[in-house]
Amino acid sequence: TSLKSTIGNYSARSNTAINLEMKWGVALLDPTFQPITQKLKNKGKVEATFANRPVSYANTNTLKTILMMTDSVNVDTVRIANRYYDSASERVHWNRNALDRYLYYNVRSWQRYRWYYTKYTANQANSMLGSICSATKDKGIVIWSVGFEVTDAAANVMRSCASSPSHFFRVEGVEISEAFKSIASQINQLRLIQ
């Protein structure tokens, strides 16, 4: 399908920012995103049935869920130093090249630190994720989380974000398929009950 093709064309850039993953997931379910959905419908990017979505949190006919998955742990998030990102050609360059790969192959190791700065640390990212997860649960959104071959530290972060301990799956290898089947089954049961 077109979606699978688009996803297949993505490539890993660098680092893990689970907090940003969650932030985007929540934004896409928030009613304030509705004007964007409307514009996408007007441009023919989404079907007309999506024009009035995301619906209000008060809508009792809708179950809002997020499935958050990682195979890593939050790490320090770095940004390219402004002096290397201040022209159109430089922005095009960085859209095509991952910073870590570029530095590894083109910049001597003792000079690399001058090319970037730390936006926030892994601990700050975990704190931001915790805040996002709490606010999301307060809105009644159900959070499922999957930690694929993660460390104990990452498992703890993912577990605390999930709506409950039973909404967290720590999996290895092919167990991931069973986790997704279980989540889908439970979501369908919730829909039938409500």
Language model features: what each stretch is:
Residues T1-Q194:
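P/S/T/G-enriched low-complexity
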